Amino acid sequence: MQKSPLEKASFISKLFFSWTTPILRKGYRHHLELSDIYQAPSSDSADHLSEKLEREWDREQASKKKPQLIHALRRCFVWRFVFYGVLLYLGEVTKAVQPVLLGRIIASYDPDNTEERSIAIYLGIGLCLLFIVRTLLLHPAIFGLHHIGMQMRIAMFSLIYKKTLKLSSRVLDKISIGQLISLLSNNLNKFDEGLALAHFIWIAPLQVVLLMGLLWDLLQFSAFCGLGLLIVLVIFQAILGKMMVKYRDKRAAKINERLVITSEVIDNIYSVKAYCWESAMEKIIESLREEELKMTRRSAYMRFFTSSAFFFSGFFVVFLSVLPYTVINGIVLRKIFTTISFCIVLRMSVTRQFPTAVQIWYDSLGMIRKIQDFLQTQEYKVLEYNLMFTGLVMENVTAFWEEGFQELLEKVQLNNDDRKTSNGENHLSFSHLCLVGNPVLKNINLNIKKGEMLAITGSTGAGKTSLLMLILGELEASEGIIKHSGRVSFSSQISWIMPGTIKENIIFGVSYDEYRYKSVVKACQLQEDITKFAEQDNTVLGEGGVTLSGGQRARISLARAVYKDADLYLLDSPFGYLDVLTEEQIFESCVCKLMASKTRILVTSKMEQLKKADKILILHEGSSYFYGTFSELQSLRPDFSSKLMGYDTFDQFTEERRSSILTETLRRFSVDDASTTWNKAKQSFRQTGEFGEKRKNSILSSFSSVKKISIVQKTPLSIEGESDDLQERRLSLVPDSEHGEAALPRSNMITAGPTFPGRRRQSVLDLMTFTPSSVSSSLQRTRASIRKISLAPRISLKEEDIYSRRLSQDSTLNITEEINEEDLKECFFDDMVKIPTVTTWNTYLRYFTLHRGLFAVLIWCVLVFLVEVAASLFVLWLLKNNPVNGGNNGTKIANTSYVVVITSSSFYYIFYIYVGVADTLLALSLFRGLPLVHTLITASKILHRKMLHSILHAPMSTFNKLKAGGILNRFSKDIAILDDFLPLTIFDFIQLLFIVVGAIIVVSALQPYIFLATVPGLAVFILLRAYFLHTSQQLKQLESEGRSPIFTHLVTSLKGLWTLRAFRRQTYFETLFHKALNLHTANWFMYLATLRWFQMRIDMIFVLFFIVVTFISILTTGEGEGTTGIILTLAMNIMSTLQWAVNSSIDTDSLMRSVSRVFKFIDIQTEESICTKIMKELHSEDSPNALVIKNEHVKKCDTWPSGGEMVVKDLTVKYVDDGNAILENISFSISPGQRVGLLGRTGSGKSTLLSAFLRMLNIKGEIQIDGVSWNSMTLQEWRKAFGVITQKVFIFSGTFRQNLDPNGKWRDEEIWKVADQVGLKSVIEQFPGQLNFTLVDGGYVLSHGHKQLMCLARSVLSKAKIILLDEPSANLDPITYQVIRRVLRQAFAGCTVVLCEHRIEAMLDCQRFLVIEQGNVWQYESLQALLSEKSVFQRALSSSEKMKLFHGRHSSKQKPRTQITAVKEETEEEVQETRL
């Protein structure tokens, strides 16, 4: 970025904003890049401003018990704010003085006042000077206030971010990420745009007093009649505003419903296409859109009346002001025109400026209070460390994630003390639940010496991660002692990648040591992965490391922890996403050898790792089940150890199954604790009345607001083999979605009834721990792509201790002053739809011809405008050519037909004309505005429908290129613009344009010479606008792109908050945040400056125009005072309206860019059109000159497919047309009714093949089903032949019936029959409404297993003959897994089944096998052939998979399989029971 020329600019350059000319010139000629933008002035840097405000806020906190943020802001910015306010006031005062001079000029034409005729020219010069002074005062004042608002926003941005990095985990669990984003976006943006109008809270009243004083001098008491109308109008606007708030809340709920299901559909578009649900989803979303539009129209009509009231009030304000005075005294034309000018200014002050200023102050003060409350929230407490202590000691440690029991009792009592009942007694009431204190950790004792390794294992949710958080200081101990040095390194369970290069992620601000770095990279098996990248370890990773596999992210996260030289290393399940071989290599080379001299705490569930640990801690329900060595475990807990060691392949099980086994084993062998009581009754959905209460973790008080506290009711264990931790404790830091369950919502409010229909928010702590909400789906997505198997060979490291090379200090990375725009662009990449710098005429044409009525309404608007102009010219003609006969009262009539005095006797004639014209124009304006707003909203409806259809029918390659968030932005942000802003902005622009053009026409009609000055003025305006828009739209685009890194960095920091605190890298991340802020500031500041450059020059052009008009009017004296008054009044009206019209035109062009983006999505080519094109190409290649006649009988009968036979010939599959082939020239066949197992390593193409069957990808070759080729029928017909269970479970917001049958094809009896068949009937029956019960938030009230059963039921209902299953048992508990196997055997007995599974034992049910390796397919007719030593499968399977399959084959033949859960002890009905 270049240095800003503002700092060296002269006073004249700053006054006229000439320093922005180079950037405007470059933007007009070339496309602007980030490097072209000037740096923000040094006074606007985030470091400087945040330090300034932070210093004042600390001073405020130190000096007062109740600190006020507004006082800190006042001390920082008040004097400049006052200075620009005075400039703004002086500029506004000139508007009040202008009508006085206008009256004097008109009076100079009075035949009886010839003395002032000679000074008319001087009065004209004075009037023009007032316009010049106003222009020179107003624009610097507005820019200065915008500048101060920007600085306040930057300072508070930084203050909020710094506070966020200090928040305690308890606070993070109480606030949502949406609240933080709201603080940094919606609210704070009001400072930038609103501060310029804030001064009108005092300027407008002073302006009104001054104007009323001047009007009193003209009209006496009559002046207050017009003011009274304006006050009534303001009250009317306030009433409409209240009504709009009511509709806004209702409408917001409807919009939320639509966006929720739209988001769900976009995130699960693969499932939607696989189920052929495009039309069904389109109908559901459009029905919600219809309900939303009803509210939108009502709200728009109210906003229309509020906005148009300003325009419509002009006639009547003047009329009511003049009428009483005229009836009594008569009036001269000078007073009429002066009154009109005064009323224009008065109307703006009363109806626009003052209400807006009041609203701005109200919003700003409320927002400052919100930020103030946020800044006073609890911060996490840094533990007191002993730097000389290198081990770890914990003595009788107990901890709660929530506030302590006694502390909460005191809070509730305190709240009740403040609220008295009518008889003066205090009441503290509790629920009748059996409340038991539930600490997350209880009486933990540890003593680990330097160099020892502690392995922590235990049941799901037992507190393993919580123990690490306790050591880090994130969890505060309520009892006990913790001792360690404080030099800690941490690797989180969920891999966290910050935006930056691979090297920066590993070094993470620690001083670079090449030997240590290379050793760590080698030990973490990253060498081979890094060499595959073009930039190697300088490769820039995007948000969350989206370009990496899950395994690569896990290894980088581990390398970061290992690279840091610390005394204590906390490794929270670092191997969860790695295959067995890679895990073994990293554990040996890194944890056991490289870190041999360090104290390590490893969370793991593998027996081999437990054996090699110096000590073992087994946790169960927050308590220590066992602490000691592995040999002590065998002697002290023989039942437990022998049970686990009885599993020959325990370490080869998935992490989920190992956790399930541990949980079940601990549950069976744990010693009964007297302090823990359990209800052995089996849980059932029939206890719906207790459902909400059992999962609420609060004290219920009848008089106090409810607080979240650390006590819950113990609930019974479920029948399944996994832990019941979700019911036993309020918060599990283990991401439960990985264990096959979805946590229930945690609400801040306690309700007496069930919580089924309610939505939950995702807290920041949920975001950090990836607890299920919207994040659970992303976790499942992640796990589907993370099983990357490293092929790196074992590495023998040197015995030298890399940590002996201790550096002088762990300093942060040097961050240069220059911003690396390219790195930022790559790190914070966001899908931006490329659109032209200026909205093209084609976009306007497409938009206004979108709806037949819209073009007709525009023509109608023009006709109404012509009628209004004609009516105005007619009135002027009457007043000019038909003098009123005043007879009795001696109306003065000069020989040259001057109409000077209107008396009471002649008043009624003028009154009827004026009122008649006013009523006509008012009615016409209403008829013009309402149809326009109505049809524009209809156009928005059409655009939404077309865009939705286009997205739902777009090929999958489109969704691979575009992010889901970018697509959702079109349906949220852009559709909101089309609904809310564009209709009224277009109405305002058209109305203002007609006012300006109409005034110019009338002025030119009265004085033709003025028309000669109008033409060049309009031409210059049009050219200047086009010149400015080229640059301004590019700056707005850059500003929008620059805003994304700010919020991305906030979310990224929150996700890795525990990591960056453990590494003490808060300052480093604050610096990165300030970099992003400075980048955005540079773009936004340039936009503000160039906008002011443009508006000032527009004012200058029309100041010149007014000068010309004034002197032409004064010098051509033959027309008299009436004509001069009309010309000057209208010219002044042009000046006051023009700036508004210009802003509206710019806003319209800016908002039309949303229309351009929507059209881009509408123009996306659909799957059907692409397939039709491919089919034509295939036919033309086969017979280029032949006549192609479609055979309607290719689809042989309505029962197709009848058998399910599949034949694949020479199939080649690509993700993109010009990409590499994933599968190439593969051929095989599947007989009807066969069960085929699809095997291969991760990334070999198993899911790709299933997608090719569904025609989701670019395919060439032949696929036949029962003799019918894929290219002989439509996509929908082809896909309906398949029943699909995808990797990612899709439950959308809707009823059970809609989720099972969204097309409404089946009767209830058939749905119930299938539900019973798959084991869902007893589940659905427990919910209120049963099939009509509404599932929300991805069906969070259902377990993962039940969601999978829903997908199974859909396939059964589809009556398909070919079933495709892509890892259906992923993350399932053993019970649900057994149910799915049973349904597959029974419900799909006569179907062809293609099963892709990572659970090798699932393959025992298959009759044939297909193995994919290196893009080729090998067929095996039996399991024995598959396991043959000569089989190519030996090269495709990892050794762990071979062990599983071998064990499964022999155990199934020779002995009963080890029971993980008591499946045989449960009846068939119990299998179908649910645990939520």
Curated annotation (Swiss-Prot):
It is found in: Apical cell membrane; Early endosome membrane; Cell membrane; Recycling endosome membrane. One of its GO terms (biological process) is positive regulation of establishment of Sertoli cell barrier. N-glycosylated. Phosphorylated; cAMP treatment promotes phosphorylation and activates the channel. Dephosphorylation decreases the ATPase activity (in vitro). Phosphorylation at PKA sites activates the channel. Phosphorylation at PKC sites enhances the response to phosphorylation by PKA. Phosphorylated by AMPK; this inhibits channel activity. GO terms for cellular component: apical plasma membrane; basolateral plasma membrane; cell surface; chloride channel complex; cytoplasm; cytosol; dendrite; early endosome. Residues 1382-1476 are annotated as: Interaction with GORASP2. It catalyses: ATP + H2O + closed Cl(-) channel = ADP + phosphate + open Cl(-) channel; chloride(in) = chloride(out); hydrogencarbonate(in) = hydrogencarbonate(out); ATP + H2O = ADP + phosphate + H(+). This is Cystic fibrosis transmembrane conductance regulator. It comes from Rattus norvegicus. The gene is Cftr.
